[in-house]
Amino acid sequence: LNHAVWAPNHRLREPWKFIYIANDNREGLEFFHKQVPAHLIVTMKNESDAYKHDENLAAVFCLIQNFKLLAWEKKLGVNVSFYDWMFDRGVCQKLGIPEKERIAAVLDLGFYLEIPEAKPASVASLKWRLL
């Protein structure tokens, strides 16, 4: 994470925080998948200003991409997940997330038994147009 936080973020707000939950530390947290060895919850500041909110969210996902690339170097698999319970204030309180923050994503962490085959990316030239 120390390297992943070198993500671009406007005005250096660094809007992220992290909660690490290991497989053996999930008592009362039945909403996590038991087959996933660990989870990293990435939270971000709630902003009433839509511009700041979008900037913060973009910065958080730049950080997540950095983390995924760095983890892959160590053969650690990272799956970015979104769950209904992320938006449940009761769950957030149970996880100790303050009212002024929200969960941006849950990273499911583990080592692959088999390396998944890479899927081909779509052709970028089909996704843009010239005005």
Identify what each model region corresponds to.
Residues L1-L131:
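Acidic, surface-exposed loops and disordered segments
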